[in-house]
Amino acid sequence: MSHNHEQEHDLITLVDEQGNETLFEVLLTIDGKEEFGKNYVLLVPAGAEEDADGQIEIQAYSFTENEDGTEGALQPIPEDADAEWIMIEEVFNSFLDED
């Protein structure tokens, strides 16, 4: 399992069910192909600042690369995917410790 983070964040636009677009920064990507057959991405709203408690909203998604090597569509991670959430939390905590 590996993760990738850089000082300059990539941006991604997510579109909700109503067609509203929201810009996000890619905080962290996680290679989970070996263990779970897919990759993961952690996103934060672009320009978001911490709230009064020092918290910031982070969203996690999985994705599987398309056959042509391009990244596929983002998929929500099921709430009951305990092993995946544990792995994501462990990698995220390591990421925080590095910063």
From Swiss-Prot:
Pfam family, one: DUF1292
InterPro entries: UPF0473
Superkingdom in the source lineage: Bacteria
Family under the similarity heading: Belongs to the UPF0473 family.
HAMAP family given in the database record: UPF0473
Protein name in the entry: UPF0473 protein SMU_2077c
Organism: Streptococcus mutans serotype c (strain ATCC 700610 / UA159)
Organism ancestry: Bacteria, Bacillati, Bacillota, Bacilli, Lactobacillales
